[in-house]
Amino acid sequence: MKRFQWVLLLAVLIIAGRAEIVQAAGNAEQTEDHAETAEQLAERTAASLETDKIGEFWNDIMTEYGGLLPESQKGSLMEFINGDKSFSPQEWLKALFSYLFHEVLANGKLLGTLILLTIFCVILQLLQNAFQQSTVSKVAYSIVYMVLIILALNSFHVAINYATEAIQTMTSFILALIPLLLALLASSGGAVSAAFFHPVILFLMNTSGLLIQNIVMPLIFLSAILSIVSTMTEQYKVTQLANLLRNIAIGALAVFLTIFLGVISVQGASAAVTDGITLRTAKFITGNFIPVLGRMFTDATDTVISASLLLKNTVGILGVAILICIAAFPAIKVLSLAFIYKLAAAILQPLGGGPVITCLDVISKSVIYIFAALAIVSLMFFLSLTVIITAGNLTMMMK
């Protein structure tokens, strides 16, 4: 009898163990099927996404700068979203360096003009000293110097146009990308985050554009003019006022960047935590208090959320890449102009100092400030997209 009890107990343990193994295998198969279903759903959803507006920006980049890229980095935006083609940072870095080299060579004519005008100014200045302040040489020197100033201001205006157009293009791209990104964020369980980001992003994007166009760029331009005027005479200097205006412009931009990042990061993180807790609570209640159907509903919801999260990360990463391309090429143009003026000042300084060399150095520094303003705005847009992408991932972590 006791032997029979031991045999019965052993049989029960074996059956229970086999049941656990079968159940574990079933769970593994269910998890694998769930992952495959989420991946298939993401591919099917990607095919129905409205990417026409974003695709226009991508096509513009391909049209203007596609000649610098290999064939592996060319193609439609949907090919990159579906995974048919992969984004290669190394190839794009090579393209950026090639474009920088091309811009420096293209500005070689400007460098030659600056060198010739500066040499003429130095020769005329020597003639003034030789002929005891001859009126003719003074007039000729003034004319050549004015031509140099006009050329410098024209280059400065071109740099401002490059930066302004790049900021406008980035703003338009963000406004086109945000609805798509927030829709995917909401479908992945981030309804509160999407409701928070939509008005805040729209307000801050438009405010940044107005700040750059109406305050920052005009102040930098006025500061450059005052600095150039200060080089014309030794008696009347306005360099302190020029420095003050420049500091106000950069300071206003830095303050706005701080406010922007503070609002986006702190409030965005709290909204993502709220989404995660809400989603977890709803899943627990549905799965435990509604028999059979509740568990099926939560599994289907997990599939949709996983697919939306996968698609959101893909679209977000491609959006960040396009944003970097929109900002990088104009920034290289601005940086090449600053390099040309700095190089001209460095080459010609051994011929003698004076207002001409100072003017070239002033223009170089002012163009660098334009580059800094463009870089700050680009960083602000880049971090805003990064926070939106991270908010969805944080929601899933909380769930």
UniProtKB/Swiss-Prot annotation:
It is found in: Cell membrane. Disruption phenotype: 4000-fold reduction in sporulation efficiency. Disulfide bonds: none annotated. Its main location: membrane. The chain crosses the membrane at residues 104-124, 140-160, 172-192, 209-229, 248-268, 315-335, 368-388. Residues 1-24 form the signal peptide. GO terms for biological process: sporulation resulting in formation of a cellular spore. The keyword Kinase does not apply. GO terms for cellular component: plasma membrane. Pfam families: Spore_III_AE. It comes from the Bacteria. It is a multi-pass membrane protein. Keywords: Cell membrane, Membrane, Signal, Sporulation, Transmembrane, Transmembrane helix. InterPro entries: Spore_III_AE. Interacts with SpoIIIJ and YqjG. Required during sporulation for activation of sigma factor SpoIIIG/SigG after engulfment is completed in the prespore. Overexpression in the absence of SpoIIIJ is synthetically lethal. This is Stage III sporulation protein AE. It comes from Bacillus subtilis (strain 168).
